[in-house]
Amino acid sequence: MITIVAPAKINLFLRICGKTDDGYHLLDSAVVFTHFGDHLTIEPAHDDQLAIIGEFASGLANADDNLVMTALNGFRAAGGVIGGLSITLEKNIPVGAGLGGGSADAAALLRAVNRLSTAPLDDDALYRLAASLGADVPVCLAGGCQRIAGIGETMTPV
Protein backbone atom coordinates (compact mmCIF):
# COMPACT_ATOMS: atom_id res chain seq x y z
CA MET A 1 0.00 0.00 0.00
CA ILE A 2 1.22 3.49 -0.81
CA THR A 3 -0.25 6.92 -0.14
CA ILE A 4 0.63 9.83 -2.40
CA VAL A 5 -0.30 13.52 -2.12
CA ALA A 6 -1.93 15.29 -5.06
CA PRO A 7 -1.01 18.90 -4.21
CA ALA A 8 -3.25 21.86 -4.98
CA LYS A 9 -2.07 24.16 -7.79
CA ILE A 10 -1.87 27.92 -7.26
CA ASN A 11 -1.62 30.36 -10.17
CA LEU A 12 0.77 33.14 -9.17
CA PHE A 13 -0.45 35.06 -12.19
CA LEU A 14 -2.59 34.16 -15.15
CA ARG A 15 -2.82 36.07 -18.41
CA ILE A 16 -5.17 34.86 -21.13
CA CYS A 17 -3.52 35.57 -24.48
CA GLY A 18 -6.17 34.22 -26.85
CA LYS A 19 -8.14 31.13 -27.70
CA THR A 20 -7.54 28.09 -29.90
CA ASP A 21 -10.01 26.95 -32.55
CA ASP A 22 -11.08 24.09 -30.27
CA GLY A 23 -11.90 26.45 -27.39
CA TYR A 24 -8.83 26.18 -25.15
CA HIS A 25 -7.44 29.41 -23.70
CA LEU A 26 -3.88 30.38 -24.60
CA LEU A 27 -2.11 31.25 -21.37
CA ASP A 28 0.90 32.88 -19.87
CA SER A 29 1.09 31.84 -16.24
CA ALA A 30 3.30 30.80 -13.36
CA VAL A 31 2.13 28.08 -10.99
CA VAL A 32 3.33 26.55 -7.75
CA PHE A 33 2.07 23.61 -5.75
CA THR A 34 1.14 23.59 -2.09
CA HIS A 35 1.88 21.02 0.61
CA PHE A 36 -1.90 20.71 0.97
CA GLY A 37 -3.87 18.44 -1.31
CA ASP A 38 -5.87 15.32 -1.92
CA HIS A 39 -4.48 11.93 -0.87
CA LEU A 40 -4.56 8.76 -2.96
CA THR A 41 -4.03 5.44 -1.21
CA ILE A 42 -3.30 2.63 -3.63
CA GLU A 43 -3.10 -1.09 -2.92
CA PRO A 44 -3.25 -4.27 -4.98
CA ALA A 45 -6.72 -5.74 -5.55
CA HIS A 46 -8.39 -8.34 -7.74
CA ASP A 47 -10.38 -5.71 -9.68
CA ASP A 48 -10.03 -1.95 -10.00
CA GLN A 49 -12.11 0.04 -7.57
CA LEU A 50 -12.21 3.67 -6.49
CA ALA A 51 -13.62 4.92 -3.21
CA ILE A 52 -13.96 8.69 -2.76
CA ILE A 53 -13.96 9.99 0.81
CA GLY A 54 -13.25 13.26 2.57
CA GLU A 55 -14.81 16.65 3.11
CA PHE A 56 -15.34 17.35 -0.61
CA ALA A 57 -16.24 13.83 -1.79
CA SER A 58 -19.88 14.77 -2.27
CA GLY A 59 -18.86 17.32 -4.92
CA LEU A 60 -17.89 14.54 -7.32
CA ALA A 61 -20.53 12.82 -9.45
CA ASN A 62 -19.34 9.21 -9.16
CA ALA A 63 -16.22 7.08 -9.12
CA ASP A 64 -16.75 5.64 -12.62
CA ASP A 65 -16.39 9.06 -14.31
CA ASN A 66 -13.46 10.19 -12.17
CA LEU A 67 -10.28 11.33 -13.93
CA VAL A 68 -8.27 9.00 -11.66
CA MET A 69 -9.86 5.96 -13.30
CA THR A 70 -9.50 7.53 -16.76
CA ALA A 71 -5.78 8.00 -16.01
CA LEU A 72 -5.44 4.38 -14.86
CA ASN A 73 -7.15 3.06 -17.99
CA GLY A 74 -5.04 5.38 -20.15
CA PHE A 75 -1.86 4.13 -18.48
CA ARG A 76 -2.72 0.57 -19.41
CA ALA A 77 -3.76 1.56 -22.95
CA ALA A 78 -0.39 3.31 -23.40
CA GLY A 79 1.41 0.07 -22.56
CA GLY A 80 1.95 0.43 -18.83
CA VAL A 81 1.57 -2.84 -16.93
CA ILE A 82 -0.18 -2.79 -13.56
CA GLY A 83 -2.49 -5.28 -11.87
CA GLY A 84 -5.86 -4.54 -10.29
CA LEU A 85 -5.89 -1.66 -7.82
CA SER A 86 -8.01 -0.50 -4.94
CA ILE A 87 -7.73 3.30 -4.84
CA THR A 88 -9.04 5.55 -2.08
CA LEU A 89 -9.20 9.22 -3.03
CA GLU A 90 -9.47 11.53 -0.03
CA LYS A 91 -10.83 14.82 -1.42
CA ASN A 92 -9.35 17.70 0.57
CA ILE A 93 -9.23 20.17 -2.35
CA PRO A 94 -12.61 21.84 -2.95
CA VAL A 95 -14.19 20.74 -6.22
CA GLY A 96 -14.32 23.49 -8.86
CA ALA A 97 -12.19 25.91 -6.84
CA GLY A 98 -9.60 26.46 -9.58
CA LEU A 99 -6.92 24.61 -7.62
CA GLY A 100 -6.44 21.82 -10.15
CA GLY A 101 -7.76 19.06 -7.89
CA GLY A 102 -8.88 16.61 -10.56
CA SER A 103 -5.76 17.21 -12.64
CA ALA A 104 -3.54 16.82 -9.57
CA ASP A 105 -5.31 13.56 -8.72
CA ALA A 106 -4.75 12.18 -12.23
CA ALA A 107 -1.08 13.24 -12.19
CA ALA A 108 -0.52 11.67 -8.76
CA LEU A 109 -2.10 8.43 -9.95
CA LEU A 110 0.17 8.39 -13.03
CA ARG A 111 3.28 8.97 -10.88
CA ALA A 112 2.29 6.19 -8.49
CA VAL A 113 1.34 3.52 -11.03
CA ASN A 114 4.42 4.27 -13.13
CA ARG A 115 6.58 3.63 -10.05
CA LEU A 116 4.68 0.42 -9.23
CA SER A 117 4.52 -0.87 -12.81
CA THR A 118 6.49 -3.88 -14.02
CA ALA A 119 6.68 -2.08 -17.39
CA PRO A 120 6.71 1.68 -16.68
CA LEU A 121 6.22 4.31 -19.35
CA ASP A 122 9.12 6.55 -20.32
CA ASP A 123 8.83 10.26 -19.50
CA ASP A 124 7.70 11.24 -23.01
CA ALA A 125 4.90 8.65 -23.04
CA LEU A 126 3.84 9.64 -19.51
CA TYR A 127 3.61 13.35 -20.47
CA ARG A 128 1.73 12.56 -23.69
CA LEU A 129 -0.76 10.55 -21.64
CA ALA A 130 -1.03 13.39 -19.11
CA ALA A 131 -1.74 15.89 -21.91
CA SER A 132 -4.48 13.64 -23.30
CA LEU A 133 -6.23 13.75 -19.91
CA GLY A 134 -6.41 17.54 -19.62
CA ALA A 135 -4.49 20.77 -20.09
CA ASP A 136 -3.46 21.01 -16.40
CA VAL A 137 -2.39 17.38 -15.94
CA PRO A 138 1.15 17.77 -17.41
CA VAL A 139 2.05 20.70 -15.13
CA CYS A 140 0.61 18.79 -12.16
CA LEU A 141 2.80 15.85 -13.17
CA ALA A 142 5.87 18.10 -13.37
CA GLY A 143 5.18 19.86 -10.05
CA GLY A 144 7.46 22.50 -8.58
CA CYS A 145 7.28 26.08 -9.80
CA GLN A 146 6.56 26.29 -13.53
CA ARG A 147 6.04 29.03 -16.08
CA ILE A 148 3.44 27.76 -18.53
CA ALA A 149 2.40 28.93 -21.98
CA GLY A 150 0.12 27.82 -24.79
CA ILE A 151 -2.71 25.71 -23.38
CA GLY A 152 -0.30 24.53 -20.70
CA GLU A 153 1.82 22.25 -22.85
CA THR A 154 4.89 24.51 -22.73
CA MET A 155 6.51 24.43 -19.30
CA THR A 156 9.69 26.03 -18.02
CA PRO A 157 10.87 25.35 -14.47
CA VAL A 158 11.35 28.56 -12.51
For each feature predicted by the language model, list its residue ranges.
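ATP-binding N-lobe of GHMP and related small-molecule kinases
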Residues: M1-A97, R115-A119, D124
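Generic structural signal for isolated residues within well-ordered alpha-helices
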Residues: G74, A112, R128-S132
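Short, small-residue alpha-helix embedded
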Residues: S103-L116
